[in-house]
Amino acid sequence: MLQPKRTKYRKKQKGRCSGLATRGDRVSFGEFGLKATTRGPITSRQIEAARRAINRYIRRGGKIWIRVFPDKPVTEKPLEVRMGKGKGNVDHWCEPIAPGRVLYELEGVSEEVAREAFRRAAAKLPVKTTFVNRTVM
């Protein structure tokens, strides 16, 4: 699973993700991309599950780029613990996604194969997505 090797601080505030994506909103590396149309956090496990779904379908046919990296720690308190007594321990890592962000890119496969691979990957993600071409951008 993806997570930073080291961070300046162990824990972060929850924060809010507003507006549209200003960076990472274009297909830069491959021919086709999977772009988010809604906002929400994506965990490292969801990123990995979608990557596996894409790889399983394209079968070494092309190259895949993962354009998101989970760098925000999510904390959780243990079960049956009363409120207070400080912030909980880091449970997992996530990436806040804004609408317009390109999540994955593919090249070296046909458009039909890319569409189906991204459709299967989108089923693993908590945000709604759309298929984009490099020429459209």
From Swiss-Prot:
Molecular function (Gene Ontology), one example: tRNA binding
Role of this protein: Binds 23S rRNA and is also seen to make contacts with the A and possibly P site tRNAs.
Keywords: Ribonucleoprotein, Ribosomal protein, RNA-binding, rRNA-binding, tRNA-binding
Similarity comment: Belongs to the universal ribosomal protein uL16 family.
Subunit structure: Part of the 50S ribosomal subunit.
CDD domains: Ribosomal_L16_L10e
Organism encoding this protein: Halorhodospira halophila (strain DSM 244 / SL1) (Ectothiorhodospira halophila (strain DSM 244 / SL1))
PANTHER family: 50S/60S RIBOSOMAL PROTEIN L16, LARGE RIBOSOMAL SUBUNIT PROTEIN UL16M
Organism phylogeny: Bacteria, Pseudomonadati, Pseudomonadota, Gammaproteobacteria, Chromatiales
Top-rank lineage group of the source organism: Bacteria
Entry's Gene Ontology BP terms: translation
GO cellular component: cytosolic large ribosomal subunit
Full protein name: Large ribosomal subunit protein uL16
